Amino acid sequence: MLKRGSIVLSIWSGINFLISSLILTIVVFHIGNSPLLEMVFEKSEIASLDAMVITSLNTLTILYNSYAVALSVLVWFVIRLCLSKGQKWAFWVLLITIGFVEIFAFIASAPLGNARWQVNIILSALYIVGIGLSGYSIFKGDKK
């Protein structure tokens, strides 16, 4: 069960890494603006926004997604090097850190009509299954 939990959490890390990297690429290389703009506003509303508003949102998008990429890499290393070996501290670190991120992902998107709900649900489900399998294995003694 520990191996399965580690795999599911690694999938969480990989999806988070890929989505955040894609968004960073789009915004940093000026391929487009923050995807949040199109999720929340109509094209006519975006056209009427001041350029500084769009730049500010893009800046926050770059900041958020750069942290998300870094967190995903750190999570992957903790899973691979520590959790998969049954180290309890790794379980608690991942439980608190990823749990914090998942809770605030819902809180952050709530005022915007839960614009990212599809992604939030998938990532939260992977987190709950992965951390649940890992925790059960570590604390019930089934470290396979």
What are these regions (language model features)?
Residues 1-144:
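Topology signature of small-to-medium multi-pass alpha-helical membrane proteins
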